[in-house]
Amino acid sequence: MASVDVSQNTSDIHFSVSAADKVAELIKEEDNSNLNLRVSITGGGCSGFQYGFSFDEQINDDDTIIIQQCSDGKSSVKLLIDSMSYQYLHDAEIDYIKGIQGEQFVIRNPNAKTTCGCGSSFSIGDEDDL
C-alpha cells in the first residue's frame, strides 16, 4: 500500500484544503471517524470514463492514501485512490468549490483530453499519454 502525505507536498495529486474541510464536515455528519473519501475512475459517462466519489472504511492493499490537513490545523482526512484510478489522476487537483451554480467537488485533470459539460466524464486519448 502506497501512502502519500500531501501536506508535505510529496504527491503528484493535489487534494485541496477546501476539499479536506468538506470531507471532514461530511464525516462528522455521518458520525463515523473511520470514513475516508474514495475517488475512483470507472468506464462510462458520455466521454468514456467517469469520476466517482464515495466514503469507505476499508483501505485496500493497492490504495494510495493521501492525507490532507484541514484548515483548523488539527484534524486531517484521508483520500483513497486505487491503483487503476491513480494512473488516470496523476497531476490532477481534487477541490471543493462554492459558486453561483452551487457547491461541488471538482477534479481538474490535465490527463483528460475531452470532458463532458457536467465535468464528471472524460476521455484520455491515447493510453501512451499516461
From Swiss-Prot:
On assembly, the entry states:
Homodimer.
Which Gene Ontology terms describe the biological processes this protein takes part in? iron-sulfur cluster assembly
Q: Which cofactor does it need?
A: iron-sulfur cluster
A GO MF term: iron ion binding
Gene3D superfamilies per record: HesB-like domain
Positions binding iron-sulfur cluster in this chain are: C46, C116, C118
UniProt keywords (A-Z) are:
Iron, Iron-sulfur, Metal-binding
**Function according to Swiss-Prot or TrEMBL:** Required for insertion of 4Fe-4S clusters for at least IspG.
What is the cofactor note? Binds 1 iron-sulfur cluster per subunit.
Q: What is this protein called?
A: Iron-sulfur cluster insertion protein ErpA
Pfam families xref list? Fe-S_biosyn
Q: Which family does it belong to?
A: Belongs to the HesB/IscA family.
Q: Which SUPFAM superfamilies match?
A: HesB-like domain (SSF89360)
